[in-house]
Amino acid sequence: MLSPYMSPIERVWFYSLRILCGLILLFLILPVLVIIPLSFNSGSFLVYPLQGFSLQWYHDFFASAEWMRALKNSIIVAPAATVLAMVFGTLAAIGLTRGDFPGKALVMALVISPMVVPVVIIGVASYLFFAPLGLGNSFFSLIVVHAVLGVPFVIITVSATLQGFNQNLVRAAASLGASPLTAFRRVTLPLIAPGVISGALFAFATSFDEVVVTLFLAGPEQATLPRQMFSGIRENLSPTIAAAATLLVAFSVILLLTLEWLRGRSEKLRTAQA
């Protein structure tokens, strides 16, 4: 909020900073804003100006066997990878947060390294690992590697939630006769659930949008929606791709709104514990 006691220089800085932030935001979302109208264009090319309004490309998307197979594959791979990432990421976060052992920082760096290692390197390494096993073009390898890419997000969000967790609640449950598993299920898990779900949503979005690893590990029968879009751009540029992209944007917006709701709920739980 602009204070009436600001000097002229402070006012200039105040407005300049907001204009700069607005320009950066516009730069980031402009490609998205450009592609959405094209998905409703009646013309057969991804060009402006629009020739008219039409839902033809959405009809073509849902009527195409290739696009539906890609969508089905994404619906298979992303939830499965999310479940694996959520389970292993949560367990790793609990162990790294509560444990105190030599090399803890190194272990943390290793488990979150998929976030910083170039995805193409992960794709090549995964192919070289799974191909000799006969799993180069399989859902199994695709799900496992997508889960590996999602685990760091779960670890980070769950670890952040555990930082404000009151361990006295677990001790109180143990003093009342609860086993460690019961205490985790009835006390710990409900309180860290916002962090777990937030990490799971990040892992799901990562898997659902991933294309580089999929190019290395998926055959034609395992092609996901992003890979189908990539192939379409290279082979047959059609506004159907814009329709698919718009659906992905809508899905991403829903995920962001869900994450924002979970963030608010997590803040309320942390305040209540304090």
Predicted regions and their residues:
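Transmembrane-helix boundary motif in ABC transporter permease subunits
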Residues: L2-E10, P79-V111, L128, Q167-V170, ...
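C-terminal transmembrane helix and the adjacent membrane-cytosol boundary/short C-terminal tail
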Residues: L2-I19, S159-A174, P180-L189, A242-A274
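Membrane-interfacial helix termini and adjacent extracytoplasmic/periplasmic loops
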Residues: S3-S7, L46, L50, L55, ...
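Interhelical loop and adjacent transmembrane-helix boundary motif
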Residues: S7-W13, G43, Y58-E66, F208-T258, ...
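Transmembrane alpha-helices
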Residues: I19-L20, L25-V32, V148, I155-Q167, ...
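Hydrophobic alpha-helical transmembrane segments of multipass integral membrane proteins
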Residues: L26, M68, K72, I76-F88, ...
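Short membrane-interfacial helix/loop motifs at transmembrane-helix boundaries
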Residues: L30-A65, L215-P220, A274
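Loop-to-helix entry region at the N-terminal start of transmembrane alpha-helices
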Residues: R69-I76, L128-F153, T157, A193-G195, ...
